Amino acid sequence: MKLYSEELWKQFRETLGLKESPLGIYYTNDKPEGITPAEGISGCMMGLLQNARKKGTTVYFDKGHFGCPGGAYYMGFFESPRPNIEYFLSCGIPGEMEGERYIKTPERAREYFTRMIPRRAPATYCVFKPVDQFQKGTKPEVVVFFAPPDILSGLFTLTHYALERTDAVYAPFRSGCGTILTYPLKEAGKEQPHAVLGMFDVSARPMFEKDILTLAMPYSV
């Protein structure tokens, strides 16, 4: 049995013009059926999520199969994305590491990570799959929509309507994986949770269509 009424879900999708199911994200100790990246570093986890979006395939990660260290960190499997991350995001280390120049100084980069510590993974696997594949008994912790501006405007408006506030959506400066999982999980613990607008990560953007952004929120929203 589905988590929701099929008729209501159909009406919701048709009204908003959704072309794809949002993804639900949850943790479990039961190994799911689906695809996972090769062991170790094998590329950005965001690219693998295209399989869940486009093909309806369950995608899962664990401490040994994570795609990229940053993704493992934001999913709560690693305590740090990589050594000297503050230099990697800023000015680099001459002769040793090229800096990405996303943050002005190493000091500011350290502050960035001090303010944003991901929740430790509560189970072995972090699973992403289309919401319309969930059955009663398993609920996602986070739901993330991948959508163009016209559909996002509808979701944006509906989120404010549902939460009865005018500040219910915000867009933090974070990585793509941070905005679809880490921050929505943080919002879940708040008395007044927000939805998180994302996919402004210039490193992740080449893996997605030019007109696609994300809106992620705790399932309770």
Label the predicted regions.
Residues E6-V221:
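Acidic, serine/proline-rich low-complexity intrinsically disordered regions
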